[in-house]
Swiss-Prot record:
Protein name per UniProt: Putative 8-amino-7-oxononanoate synthase
Residues noted as binding pyridoxal 5'-phosphate in the record, renumbered to the chain: 110-111, 182, 207-210, 239-242
PANTHER family per UniProt: 8-AMINO-7-OXONONANOATE SYNTHASE, CLASS II AMINOTRANSFERASE/8-AMINO-7-OXONONANOATE SYNTHASE
Catalyzed reaction equations: 6-carboxyhexanoyl-[ACP] + L-alanine + H(+) = (8S)-8-amino-7-oxononanoate + holo-[ACP] + CO2
Complexes and interactors: Homodimer.
Keyword Transferase set for record: yes
Length: 395
């Protein structure tokens, strides 16, 4: 190997080790279940995005099998070549009916959706206003676009308005936000963001990755909680890989936006389409989340229980108001030690460190699901509290 490159890479890896930011892969089995196997140890799964427990649902498995038998295992090409199966159009119609939008586009992942949409819509003549805690895919999309990047303090609408007010009137304006923030579990002020976008002539993209299938009418997303709010949002992005238990993502909104993305979005144009099996499972999942209110109600109730008990115990869980509940520790060292102790006690509790979260805010990110029982959560809370006291971390 080229020696200068080897030296450079070894130095960078050593720095990651020293900073407590080196990452390893761990073999995990049964991750679709409430209890998983990680490194051959049985643990309560409090780290998964399988929020409604659909990743192991027999109805989704059967739908995937049926489509595989009918269409094969691969799409064989990009959608613009010969990979656009009728399944795509069926799923996109379902999304439009679900979200109340004109047109939808199914893409390969949430990351490629955000990177592709933002980088194709915005250019160096534009300004993108982004919440400081938005997902990395949003940040990367803005960087790739070459647009002026204005980050406003997390959920600070006054700061955003100052930035909008002082922006060049000659430049087009785009606001982009997560609806549920993936590492903090709090939510965006969508009504107020829409008011600002209308006041200053911007458009807005919302990332519903951690809200699709859960919140709003029929689980359509956080933007559907308030009447008439969703239709004022220009582009909705959501994923199939979390609450819907599948893989892939969608972009939906007015037809002109989606038509433009279909023609200009490089992460859509230059990639092989999703396999038919995934589309079959997605179609079934969209049906289920609209009808199965009990799963969504269980998830929301479990989130409320878990948050309230951790707060009562004295933990810093920030402003979490959803099924995503962080315990903010601070240092990488303490967070890694806490994570190790929790896993030894039988809880899949993963340390989240910079650059995923800001420096000095390393945390354990817990995610409850609709399938957890109160007994599961109580068992976990007792052990979390006991270990934290032993380590003199929080309580």
């Amino acid at each position: 190997m080229n020696q200068p490159w080897r030296t450079h890479l070894q130095t960078k890896l050593q720095q990651l080790h020293e900073q407590g930011q080196y990452r390893n892969l761990h073999v995990t089995e049964q991750a679709e279940e409430t209890w998983l196997i990680r490194d051959e140890k049985r643990m309560l799964n409090l780290a998964s995005n399988n929020y409604l427990g659909l990743a192991g649902d027999e109805r989704l498995k059967e739908a995937a099998i049926v489509c595989t038998r009918k269409y094969g295992t691969g799409a064989t090409a990009s959608r613009l070549v010969v990979g656009n199966y009728s399944l795509y159009e069926e799923v996109e119609r379902s999304i439009c009916n679900w979200k109340g939008t004109e047109k939808a586009l199914v893409v390969n992942s949430g990351f490629t959706a955000n990177v592709g949409a933002i980088s194709s819509l915005a250019c160096r003549h534009d300004i993108v206003f982004s919440d400081k805690l938005n997902h990395a895919s949003i940040v990367d999309g803005i960087i790739l676009s070459g647009a002026e990047h204005k980050r406003y303090r997390h959920n600070d609408l006054n700061h955003l308005e100052v930035l909008l007010k002082t922006a060049s009137p000659e430049k087009r304006k785009l606001i982009v936000t997560d609806t549920v923030f993936s590492m903090d579990g709090d939510t965006a002020y969508l009504r107020e963001l829409v008011q600002l976008k209308e006041k200053y002539g911007a458009i807005i993209i919302v990332d519903e990755a951690h809200a699709s299938g859960i919140y709003g009418i029929g689980g359509a997303g956080l933007s559907h909680i308030e009447k008439d709010l969703a239709q004022k949002i220009d582009i909705h992005m959501g994923t199939f890989s979390k609450a819907l238990g599948c893989y892939g993502a969608y972009l939906t909104g007015d037809a002109i936006y989606i038509e433009y993305l279909q023609n200009m979005m490089r992460s859509f144009i230059f990639t092989t389409a999703l396999p038919p099996s995934t589309l079959g499972a997605v179609q079934k999942a969209i049906e289920i989340v609209q009808e199965d209110h009990k799963r969504r109600e269980n998830l929301i109730a479990n989130g409320e229980y878990f948050r309230s008990k951790l707060r009562e115990a004295g933990f810093n869980i920030g402003n979490s108001s959803t099924h995503i509940v962080p315990i903010v520790v601070g240092s990488n060292e303490n967070t890694l030690r806490f994570s190790k102790r929790l896993q030894e006690a039988g809880i899949a509790a993963i340390a989240i460190r910079p650059p995923t979260v800001p420096v000095h805010s390393s945390r354990i990110r817990f995610a409850v699901t609709s399938q957890h029982t109160i007994a599961d959560l109580k068992w976990a809370i007792d052990r979390i509290t006991h270990i934290a006291k032993e380590e003199e971390l929080f309580v």
